[in-house]
Amino acid sequence: MELTAGVTTELSGAEITLRCLQEEGVEIMFGYPGGAVLPLYDEIFKQEKVKHILVRHEQAAVHAADAYARSTEKVGVVLVTSGPGVTNAVTGIATAYMDSIPVVIISGQVPTHAIGQDAFQEVDAVGVTRPCVKHNFLVKDVKDLAVTMKKAFYLAATGRPGPVLVDIPKDVQTAKTNFFYPQSVSMRSYNPVVKGHSGQIRKALQLLLEAKRPMVYTGGGVVLGNAAAELLQLVHTLGFPCTNTLMGLGGYPATDPQFVGMLGMHGTYEANMAMQTCDVLLAIGARFDDRVIGNPKHFFQEERKIIHVDIDPSSISKRVRVDVPIVGDVREVLQEMSRQLAAGKERPDPVALKTWWDQIGAWRGRDCLKYDRNSKIIKPQSVVEKLYELTKDMDMYVTSDVGQHQMWAAQFYKFNKPRRWINSGGLGTMGVGLPYALGVQLAHPHATVACVTGEASIQMCIQELSTAKQYRLPVKI
């Protein structure tokens, strides 16, 4: 590891932790106190740069930090105590992990001399969270604390983002050492590829230009990779149909005529038919989830060439065989695609494209999302449509719980911007909606935040209404 110059001062481990957060530009953290983190809480109250939000349950702390990260491009931060504090947080951590959200979780731990002795409120935080974090650390020496915190933020935010846990024993929090915060870290075992291979990009473009029935399939990676503008430019240049997954909504504007709707088991007929019958498929920041393609064996009954762009090499050819893999940051790859396309004169066959769009138009004609608009009973679909009409010109964010209401929100609210739709797609965690709304509202105090929820989901984290009241957060439910 290489370190660059920082600042040197003798501080306690708790002071170092707070200084690290300040160095990373953290403004808000979510947490719940306990015995193993009291030194940290003592330091929180001595400073004003990092605001602490007291939730009513550790699960909600992680959900709120998760939503804060989703809506801001920043890393969410959580502070929990040892034992039940960590175990309560696991559902939130797993939710963030499945959706690739950058969150740093700081957990207290029993003193180092008591680890492994079944001490009061002792839990193996590293072992418990190993399956649902991008990485985790147990800090046994205060001298390692600052660089570990730097690593945690670096790992959480780069490559394929994800939650990182830092477990800090109580005696490490009280021990003192010189504070040196590195401005950067370099780890030989971790080196995410950013730029896609130019040869693979050329090969992909050739396939796309020769396609008769092309399709662009995008997921949450476009949103997380801040590649919405680059995607729109490429799709408009090519003239291809584009679809988003549940996690990708907003990555391509829903009101654009080339958008064929959401994909998957709750998606539109035209999006699914185009996906199943295309001859060249460009997948960007998506992972061919079972809710999108179903059984991979059935998906391959039709012949097609697949191009897959993703920052995570382990996602490529994981569920389906890929013809042209491109590992890299989706924004960088899309920019290079547009550059190469602009440099050449070749364009897709307009006659073949018209025939393809005519077929898609016929599928659209089925109006698969229609419902009885004359019913005397208020339909949920109508409620979501009305919400969109009332708020489409506002600075608006929509959070959702998990269930049928989530799908109605995804189907009938037209998301034209990224990071405006906050929901649990991978783990499908009921109860996220309200704490998500709190996290978004704190991140965007002047925006309007609405939580679409169901009668069961709202009860799973309903105690967070108290948090909303305490901090005067005007979320709409």
Where are the regions that the model predicts?
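Conformationally flexible catalytic loops at phosphate/diphosphate-handling active centers
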Residues: L155-E210, C368-L369
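Active-site diphosphate/adenylate-binding microenvironment
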Residues: A14-L18, Q22-E27, L40-I44, D358-P435, ...
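Glycine-rich phosphate/diphosphate-binding loops that line cofactor/substrate pockets in enzymes
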Residues: E15-V26, A67-E73, Y97, L155-R160, ...
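A short, small-residue-rich loop immediately preceding and capping a beta-strand
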Residues: L21, E27-F30, V50-I53, S71-V110, ...
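Glycine-rich, anion-gripping cofactor-binding loops and their flanking helix/strand elements
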Residues: R70, G220-I307, N416-A447, Q459-Q463
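Phosphate/pyrophosphate-binding active-site segments
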Residues: M1-T8, K143, Q206, E303, ...
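Thiamine diphosphate
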Residues: I106, A114-Q121, N272, T277, ...
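Conserved thiamine diphosphate
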Residues: F120-G159, T277-C278, V324-P325, V333, ...
